[in-house]
Amino acid sequence: MYLILILRHTSIQHFNIKVVSMNHTPVLENQFVRLEPLDIKHGEALVKCIDAELWRGMVTPPPLNVDLMIEYIIGMKSDSAKMPFAVVSRVTNEIVGSTSFYDYAPAQKRIELGSTFYSRDVWGSAVNPSCKLLLCSYAFDQLDVNRLAFRCDSRNERSAGAIKKLG
């Protein structure tokens, strides 16, 4: 069972969001976070973001070592319907997690957000809302989608709660 929230098309340009192109994959940033195209170079830092409670309710097993994380990253990057990002805190300049667009269907003008995880250090901070704002703005203003959905497994109570907090 999935929780799905649909947002209407709105322009969010007054938030001063900067979009920079890098190999046809965007780097998105605001005052709190920078979203960089996910790469195997992020593997070691991302492993440090994983813990058992964080991954509870996810549909895939946790990538608990660098080799498994690199496999996870390669899998995310190999799917043309996904656009995965490493999340970098602009406060600490450290990688604090990952988030993704997926199931992008340009012909239907729809996209989903998910496959998100963050270091426990940033739970409840401005990181998640900042990431979602950047992704929503990019989806509506650059990808020109009409429908955006957040999807999480119903067993993933932490993610469902974080989505509800977005409003």
Predicted regions and their residues:
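Glycine-rich acyl-CoA binding loop
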Residues: 128
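Conserved active-site alpha-helix within GNAT-family acetyltransferase domains
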Residues: 156-167
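Alpha-helical, largely C-terminal catalytic domains
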Residues: 135
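GNAT-family acyltransferases
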Residues: 13-125, 138, 142
